[in-house]
Amino acid sequence: MNEFDRVRDYLTDLQDRICAAVEAIDGKARFAEDLWQRAEGGGGRTRILRDGAVFEQAGIGFSDVSGARLPPSASAHRPELAGATWRACGVSLVFHPHNPHIPTTHANVRYFRAERDGEMVAAWFGGGFDLTPFYPVDEDVMHWHRTAQALCAPFGEERYAAHKRWCDEYFFLRHRDETRGVGGLFFDDLGQDFERDFAYQRAVGDGFLDAYLPIVERRKDTPYGEAERAFQLYRRGRYVEFNLVYDRGTLFGLQSGGRAESILMSLPPQVRWEYGFQPQPGSAEARLADYLIPRDWLG
């Protein structure tokens, strides 16, 4: 089996396993599957769970797509690849819980291959996961980062620190001067050693559930009211702003003629903006600002 097919098989299995785990913890709703084809090449399967007991919406998509020419978003940092043919596969997910005390989360693992005249000119892995709480709890954030550190440990002492820093820098809303959440891991252009890099991608993909599900279990029965729900919807606006303004995956998908429904499944089903909103000083809502600054979460 060639390298691309090995990655592809892992990713389809990862999607299956995450869906099964989410359905189990939700206990009510199930994923609906949408199989799709892309005219320019390839296709995928998008799965959406809606109106569950825990999740308002959970979307997880697998895609294996190809094209005759790299779009600008993919070659901006690699100008030598401009005009190359390409093929990419990946799994991307975003989960929006009902309860404002459960953080929203995002994860992505992907593999990209570029060719010219039938010869591979570049191939690399990318991905990571990040956490966006509305009412953060130190215990949860520390668990998230300690899980990330543990899965990084076999790949060198600097791996966690480097990819945590990259995550803090990437998921930053410059126009708001704040991070999107409390970070996690982010990496791209990892293509020096296929076996080692593929092992790391698997560690990140497999580690996501270990990082997220214990937080869901701890917070899913926390009581909340209209004020917490309103704040959750307001903060979801930041999620929308980042995805539509900065996210390279979203831009790549749209610029490459990707399937808009699947690309935009990350957006929350409900969201609100409020002009000039400021939380009351000392309130639980005001505490969030202290978490939207990069810091050491290992304790």
UniProtKB/Swiss-Prot annotation:
Residues 239-274 are annotated as: Important for dimerization. It comes from the Bacteria. Substrate binds at residues 92, 108-110, 257-259. The record marks 175 as: Important for dimerization. Signal peptide: none annotated. A divalent metal cation binds at residues 96, 106, 145, 175. GO terms for biological process: protoporphyrinogen IX biosynthetic process. Pathway: Porphyrin-containing compound metabolism; protoporphyrin-IX biosynthesis; protoporphyrinogen-IX from coproporphyrinogen-III (O2 route): step 1/1. Keywords: Cytoplasm, Heme biosynthesis, Metal-binding, Oxidoreductase, Porphyrin biosynthesis. Belongs to the aerobic coproporphyrinogen-III oxidase family. This is Oxygen-dependent coproporphyrinogen-III oxidase. The lineage of its organism: Bacteria, Pseudomonadati, Pseudomonadota, Gammaproteobacteria, Lysobacterales. The gene is hemF.
